[in-house]
Structures are given as C-alpha cells and as structure tokens.
C-alpha cells in the first residue's frame, strides 16, 4: 500500500529507520533515548524496522517499546508515519509519497528480491526464498509487486536471531549477529 503525505508550510518531517526495539543489537535500548528526534518536526517517518513484529523471542519486548515510543510521539504532537520493513512487515504502508510524489521513501529491504541476501533468514531458507521470487516475476519492473514480494518474504521466512540474554554461547551469539540486521 502507498501512503501519501503533503506537508503544510512550516511543517517538517524527519526520517529514521532500523531502530529495532527489543533486539539485542539495537543501539537505542529504551524509547526515551530517542526523544531528541521529536524536537522540531511535525511528522516522524519511520522507514521500516521500528521493532520486531514477527514471531520471535524479541517480539514482546519490541512491541512494548514500540508502543511507548508512539505514545511519546503523540505526547510531543508529532505524527508518526510507519512504513513496513523486513522486521515489521505488518505495517500497512510500504511506500510513502511525500509532496505529491516528488519525494518517495521506503525501507531498503525491497531493493533486493531476497530481502537481505546476506542474512540468516535467506541463507537458511534459500529454497523457499527462490520459490517466492519465482512467484513474483513482475517484481523486477513493478515497484508495488516488489514491495508485495518483500512483505511476503518477510512474513513467510522466519527470523533467525535471539534477544539479549537468550543465548548462552557468546561465540555463537557473535556469529549469529555478525550479519546484522
């Protein structure tokens, strides 16, 4: 789905992505650490991966922090605009057209048919991924089909990582996270 946003004179939008609330490697551990992003803007565009919404050990913590962050936005009078990423494919919009389409924003996962060809999800599920790609031949030339492929791939290929404190072996944890995100 495409979302449109036209800013009125004096309104400002700030763009961020890949916050990954709940994930062990997230740089911002708590939503309050990002309060400064809400200063001086009327809209905050999150270009995917605010938190993990797929079934995973990180989901519950990520959703709780996501809700707190969105509450912070509302309290600051900032309108959040959430776009789908590979970790939150259930967000409604995959593409934002700003100012009548002169500016477009999306999460980078749609740039690759494999979503993240360097990631564990693809490496552990190559056959399923290849079958999905074959089912979307129009995705080569049609952006909306590419976004649909990316969303489908993100939903059907399960996440492969752990949250902080859930993995005993530090070497294995390091190796599992070496291909972040």
Language-model segment annotations:
Residues 1-181:
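Extended recognition/assembly regions associated with phosphoester-bond processing machinery
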